[in-house]
């Protein structure tokens, strides 16, 4: 009796992609699976056809051969015995439905290798270090690959043995009602191998807990909440898997003089009212040393003066921010009698506190107050 066309069995066109093949197989396999049709010989035979068609069409080489030669390409080589009962092929029912039912029934995918965990380290630095860049040494607790067994977990001269429970696959198949699902092997914990002669140093784990010292290069311009990634400096992986990464989380401590806003620095510069009125020159601090700042006459409190290039260097470019100095005019305190007299005379020379010429802002303020109360009495 001639075999049916594999494409017709799955109900797909010859141009079907891998995703369409899998989708059709899932739908038909669920419908005709023997666990759902116990005692139904027709369903059993139908499932065998579906399984056979899927295994040919999902394999690129077999599909190409089938498209060229038809069923004759497999008459001498393809074995379809025990199609559904043993589920030993690479395309078994558990593989197809594991992604759907694995979470429900506690199933687990291959756990043979597992990348090491990423680590995070919180680092505090000063503003000076953030602006200029620096190198810091840190010490972190982590898991490192065992240097005695090189991560294998076995004693010298031995190697892991294949697990007799799962035959090295790392998974076993458990019947759950109508379904047979994959689960991680309880004997080898999904690894596929067991260690009969474990390494004495790591006790078969392949890695040991230790403290690791690292040198971290901090670039100029780093800021709070920035992260520095150190590739493969996290925990060692299991069974030869690559290690994780280390992320250094930055925090720049507050400075007693400067405040940072992006790449600019701000500071307050107190001056006496004489300098504010007459002008002068004052030394101001920068992170590179002292510089002279010229104060023009008639400077008002709160005025900002910009010193270019004395801020923070950008991490992304070579440009550097500015230093902005906010002038604060101080009111003199602890005056002696002579100073009080001189200030009184100075105030009288201004024609009181509302002098039009010497205190224009005061005049505007008090004129506004007068208009406000005049409007209330109308």
Curated annotation (Swiss-Prot):
Positions annotated as zinc finger (CR-type) = 133-211
Name its co-factor(s): Zn(2+)
Show the PROSITE patterns listed in the entry. DNAJ_1, DNAJ_2, ZF_CR
Q: Which residues bind Zn(2+) 1?
A: 146, 149, 199, 202
GO CC term, one of those recorded: cytoplasm
- The J domain, residue ranges: 5-70
Cofactor binding description: Binds 2 Zn(2+) ions per monomer.
* Gene Ontology MF: a single term: zinc ion binding
Where the CXXCXGXG motif repeats fall, as residue ranges, is 146-153, 163-170, 185-192, 199-206
* Keyword annotations from UniProtKB, A to Z: Chaperone, Cytoplasm, DNA replication, Metal-binding, Repeat, Stress response, Zinc, Zinc-finger
Task: Tell me where in or outside the cell this protein is found.
Answer: Cytoplasm
Please name the InterPro entries in this protein's record. Answer: DnaJ (IPR012724), DnaJ_C (IPR002939), DnaJ_domain (IPR001623), DnaJ_domain_CS (IPR018253), HSP40/DnaJ_pept-bd (IPR008971), HSP_DnaJ_Cys-rich_dom (IPR001305), HSP_DnaJ_Cys-rich_dom_sf (IPR036410), J_dom_sf (IPR036869)
Where does the UniProt entry say this protein principally localizes?
A: cytoplasm
Is Cytoplasm included in the keywords of this UniProt record? yes
For biological process, the GO terms are: chaperone cofactor-dependent protein refolding; DNA replication; protein refolding; response to heat
Question: What does the entry list as the binding residues for Zn(2+) 2?
Answer: 163, 166, 185, 188
Q: Domain comment, in the record's words?
A: The J domain is necessary and sufficient to stimulate DnaK ATPase activity. Zinc center 1 plays an important role in the autonomous, DnaK-independent chaperone activity of DnaJ. Zinc center 2 is essential for interaction with DnaK and for DnaJ activity.
User: Entry's PANTHER family?
Assistant: CHAPERONE PROTEIN DNAJ (PTHR43096:SF48), DNAJ HOMOLOG 1, MITOCHONDRIAL-RELATED (PTHR43096)
Q: What does this protein do?
A: Participates actively in the response to hyperosmotic and heat shock by preventing the aggregation of stress-denatured proteins and by disaggregating proteins, also in an autonomous, DnaK-independent fashion. Unfolded proteins bind initially to DnaJ; upon interaction with the DnaJ-bound protein, DnaK hydrolyzes its bound ATP, resulting in the formation of a stable complex. GrpE releases ADP from DnaK; ATP binding to DnaK triggers the release of the substrate protein, thus completing the reaction cycle.
Q: How does it assemble?
A: Homodimer.
Q: Mind telling me which NCBIfam families this protein's record contains?
A: DnaJ_bact, PRK10767.1
Q: In which family does this protein belong, per the annotation?
A: Belongs to the DnaJ family.
Q: What is this protein called?
A: Chaperone protein DnaJ
């Amino acid at each position: 009796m001639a075999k049916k066309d594999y494409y017709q069995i799955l109900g797909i066109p010859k141009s079907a992609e891998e995703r369409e093949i899998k989708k059709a197989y899932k739908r038909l396999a669920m419908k005709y699976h023997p666990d759902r049709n116990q005692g139904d010989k027709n369903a059993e035979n139908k499932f065998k056809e579906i399984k056979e068609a899927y295994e040919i069409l999902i394999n690129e080489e077999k599909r190409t051969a089938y498209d060229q030669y038809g069923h004759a390409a497999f008459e001498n080589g393809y074995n379809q015995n025990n199609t559904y009962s043993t589920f030993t092929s690479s395309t078994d029912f558990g593989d197809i439905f594991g992604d759907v039912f694995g979470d429900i029934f506690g199933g687990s995918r291959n756990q043979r290798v597992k990348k090491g965990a990423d680590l995070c380290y919180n680092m505090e630095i000063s503003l000076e270090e953030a602006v200029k860049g620096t190198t810091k040494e840190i010490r972190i607790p982590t898991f490192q690959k065992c240097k005695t067994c090189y991560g294998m977990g076995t004693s010298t001269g031995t190697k892991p043995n294949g697990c007799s429970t799962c035959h090295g696959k790392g998974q076993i198949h458990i019947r759950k009602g109508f379904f047979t699902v994959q689960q991680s092997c309880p004997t080898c914990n999904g690894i596929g191998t067991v260690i009969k002669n474990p390494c004495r140093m790591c006790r078969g784990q392949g890695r040991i807990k230790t403290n690791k010292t690292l040198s971290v290069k901090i670039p100029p311009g780093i800021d709070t909440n920035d992260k520095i990634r150190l590739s493969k400096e996290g925990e060692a992986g299991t069974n030869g898997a690559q290690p994780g990464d280390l992320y250094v989380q930055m925090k720049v401590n507050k400075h007693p003089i400067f405040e940072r806003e992006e790449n600019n620095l701000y500071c307050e510069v107190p001056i006496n009212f004489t300098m504010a009125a007459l002008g002068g020159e004052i030394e101001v601090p920068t992170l590179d040393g002292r510089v002279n700042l010229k104060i023009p006459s008639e400077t008002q409190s709160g005025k900002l003066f910009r010193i270019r290039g004395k801020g923070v260097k950008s991490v992304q470019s070579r440009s550097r921010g500015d230093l902005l100095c906010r002038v604060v005019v101080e009111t003199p305190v602890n005056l002696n009698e002579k100073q009080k007299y001189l200030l009184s005379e100075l105030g009288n020379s201004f024609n009181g506190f509302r002098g039009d010429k010497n205190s224009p802002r005061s005049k505007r303020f008090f004129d506004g107050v007068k208009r406000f109360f005049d409007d209330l009495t109308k």
